[in-house]
Amino acid sequence: MARFRGSITKVSRRLGIALSPKAEKYLERRPYAPGQHGQSRRGKVSEYALQLREKQKMKYLYGILEKQFRNYYKKAVAQRGVTGDNLVKMLERRLDNVVYRCGFSPSRAGARQLVTHGHMLVNGKKVNIPSFLVSPGDQIEFRQKSRNLDAVADSLNKVPDSRIPEWIQVDKANRKAVFLAIPEREAVQEPFNEQLVVELYSK
């Protein structure tokens, strides 16, 4: 699957959100957009620019390119309920996102690598597709030979239990987790406004 290969730190500074642990540290030192005029940019931002910015936040946070993101939006529209809520719920069900939420990786990019490299099992079967949608009751775990990866142990040691959401039950010792439920929108604490994205695509 194609993925973004540019500077995540620069994108983080432009959007004002941390897209990786490294970017988070960088933003603490330079909390403004990159470039010569990063600290002095002012002026009224157009409605379109605001909508586009929120879309970029969602795409980069979940590591999704435009074509796939638009497909998620179309599916969200076709479902019952609030389109924006449906969109967020689908993104939260992605396997790479769930692996990240479990604390098995400090970033979604790292979680995506764990999936694509074949380290993860879902209900006992290997799944190497990051966009695989996890369902309530699914068990996510590492393959036997992957359970002692140093990077995973390091991530679990650093990730506080408070970061693991209530809709996932994690067994750190055995490198396992159960996806208990699809989260409600208000439970997902991410710095974006999906309603502006819906307005953008509705035009």
UniProtKB/Swiss-Prot annotation:
Presence of keyword rRNA-binding: yes
Protein name (database record): Small ribosomal subunit protein uS4
Keyword Flavoprotein applies: no
Superkingdom of the source species: Bacteria
Entry's family note: Belongs to the universal ribosomal protein uS4 family.
Domain S4 RNA-binding: start-end pairs: 93-154
Listed GO biological process terms: ribosomal small subunit biogenesis; translation
Keywords, ordered alphabetically: Ribonucleoprotein, Ribosomal protein, RNA-binding, rRNA-binding
Any one Pfam family match given in the protein's UniProt record, by short name: Ribosomal_S4
Record-linked HAMAP family: Ribosomal_uS4_B
Subunit structure: Part of the 30S ribosomal subunit. Contacts protein S5. The interaction surface between S4 and S5 is involved in control of translational fidelity.
Function according to Swiss-Prot or TrEMBL: One of the primary rRNA binding proteins, it binds directly to 16S rRNA where it nucleates assembly of the body of the 30S subunit.
SMART domains named among the record's database cross-references: Ribosomal_S4, S4
Cross-referenced SUPFAM superfamilies: Alpha-L RNA-binding motif (SSF55174)
InterPro entries referenced in this protein's UniProt entry, alphabetically: Ribosomal_uS4, Ribosomal_uS4_bac-type, Ribosomal_uS4_CS, Ribosomal_uS4_N, S4_RNA-bd, S4_RNA-bd_sf
Gene: rpsD
GO molecular-function terms, A-Z: rRNA binding; structural constituent of ribosome
GO CC field: small ribosomal subunit
